[in-house]
Amino acid sequence: MEQDGKKFGLGSSGSVVVLTIRAITALYGLALSAEETFKLAAYVLLKRGDNGSMGDVACIAYEDLIYYQSFDRKRIAEQINESPLESILAQDWGTVIRRIQPQLTFDFFVGWTKEPAISRDLINQVKSAISSSFLTQTQEEVLRPEKALLAGEKEIMKESLEKVSHLLVELSPAIYNEKLRVLKRASQGLDCVAKSSGAGGGDCGIALSFSEADSQILVERWRGAGIDLLYKERWGMDE
């Protein structure tokens, strides 16, 4: 998934793996649940050495807006070399995935900066800076948006995403390069909120807009800054 030789950083590896699994299971007449598809795709990616959270894989496998809490990836990766596939897939991985029916109406956007994400070395540097305080605060901010979506609390949703964005800035300046800062600033003065997505340092950012008029302004600002709109989806009460 690329344009002019530049790869889109929006979970394309996970997309390819999930779609390949679905194609094979369809060919052989097998019916896999969303959970089974997720676990099989995560298994494949872990075996390849992928170090991601697998959150993108969960979204793709469930084809829905979800709350996601990752499993112990290190433990499962170690078992891949020790146990058969059937045994690993049959285990309770400890993953938490819940479908969300939002009580808010909003546009969800993905903007592409056309710049590569930070390198694996920089990712490792960022990981080394992660503290217990950072983990505690981010966990709180993962729970708040779920509650806000279910309760229709727009301002709490916006505040929480802003807090996560601030935590990432404090964690490492490498996460928000200039293009991602522009992507985020484009939401200022609008009924919108934007932040980086994925590893950071480039690739993609996301935005939520709670006003159709502001959605148009946001996209125009992105376009003027050379940021491509890769994806748009409307969620909520009037979808």
Model-identified regions with their sequence ranges:
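C-terminal nucleotide
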Residues: M1-K6, A26-L30, K39-N51, V57-A199, ...
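DPxDG-like acidic metal-binding loop motif
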Residues: G9-A31
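Conserved short hydrophobic patches within well-ordered secondary structure
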Residues: V16, C204-I206
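A sequence/structural signal of beta-propeller blade repeats
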Residues: A34-E35
